Amino acid sequence: MIIVTGMPGAGKDEFVKVARSLGFMDLHMGNTVREYASRNGIPDDDKEIGNFAASERKKFGMDIWARRTAEKIESDELTVIDGVRNKEEMDYFSKFSKSIYVVAIFANRKTRLERILKRDRPDDIRSMEGLIERDNRELSWGIGNVIALADYMIVNDESLEIFYERSRKLLFDHFLIRA
């Protein structure tokens, strides 16, 4: 099982696209948060969804989004989970697999903002100030610890083609040989 982490806009979704093209099953914790937020009438906006996610963590524990996402796990083999934000979520997923590997995706803040503005998701931030606020919120949840504990890191500061190449190489060299 691979856990993908990184700050907003770093390239986690693009890594997952590469993994999916190689036969990995993918689960997105952010989709789980958005699904639950929608069911609870939360507006599709970054701040509202972020507050909802934080509130649920406070009520039900830091691993609540891992528990809710895990309901969709079919097998631990060739599974990529995108969006782990804290060590408690990592620990929860370790119950499903004898081998958990964390891949951190890194890009600088300016590059991440440019990417976020291009992807134009309804719940995304629209300014550097908004990105700084979101980064601080995610850091308060413990994402920095997950990144620091990563088994592998891919720096995503060049073209998409180079990032895809780095992602494929990592997946082939470290994960597909074992499958």
UniProtKB/Swiss-Prot annotation:
Residues bound to ATP: 6-13
Organism name: Thermoplasma volcanium (strain ATCC 51530 / DSM 4299 / JCM 9571 / NBRC 15438 / GSS1)
GO molecular function ontology, one term from the record: ATP binding
Lineage: Archaea, Methanobacteriati, Thermoplasmatota, Thermoplasmata, Thermoplasmatales
Keywords from the named record: ATP-binding, Nucleotide-binding
Protein family (similarity comment): Belongs to the UPF0200 family.
HAMAP family, A to Z: UPF0200
Leader peptide range in chain numbering: none
Coiled coil: none
Pfam families cross-referenced by the UniProt entry: AAA_17
Protein name (Swiss-Prot/TrEMBL): UPF0200 protein TV0279
